[in-house]
Amino acid sequence: MKKYRIIYADPPWSYYNDSNANPDCTTIKGMRRPPYNVMGSKEIMNLPIKSISAKNCILFIWTTDYHLQKCLEVIKKWGFEYKTVGFAWNKKCCFMGAYTMKSGIELCLLATKGKDAHKLVKKHNIRALIEEKRTKHSKKPDEVRKRIVELMGDIPRIELFARQKTEGWDVWGNEVESDINLT
């Protein structure tokens, strides 16, 4: 199987009872169900990401504050070590949150695999803050992909849970024609 040095993932986190991703479960605090299939954190953790990650690899993975702890567990299970927030997206239009603070941001965490993964970074002046209005539900700004390539160069890369085909990227997901079989 092809090995990637960049893995960019936007898991379809479930806001239901996390023991499963049953769409018939009640959502938290009246949140609407998303217009796509969701996955429980255990299902996300069990994806065979180790089989597609190169010896030295950098993972960019989206999470919300609600799923932050689960995302850190996913990172570890996939064989990576959390390093920092890669990108913070200020949606400039909405404030979400079901428990305490109302947040209009999402985080894209950066994690590494391999003792030389840090050598994959080619530029050190890429801004982490993305300020762009939200469009389609859960669609992340295209600018993030551009900044990842600017940061790391034109190396083998894949977007997991992709919604669109992007030039230079392999993709996997149920909303696109996938370049690999991951399940």
Show the residue positions of the predicted features.
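Class I S-adenosyl-L-methionine-dependent methyltransferase catalytic core
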Residues: M1-T183
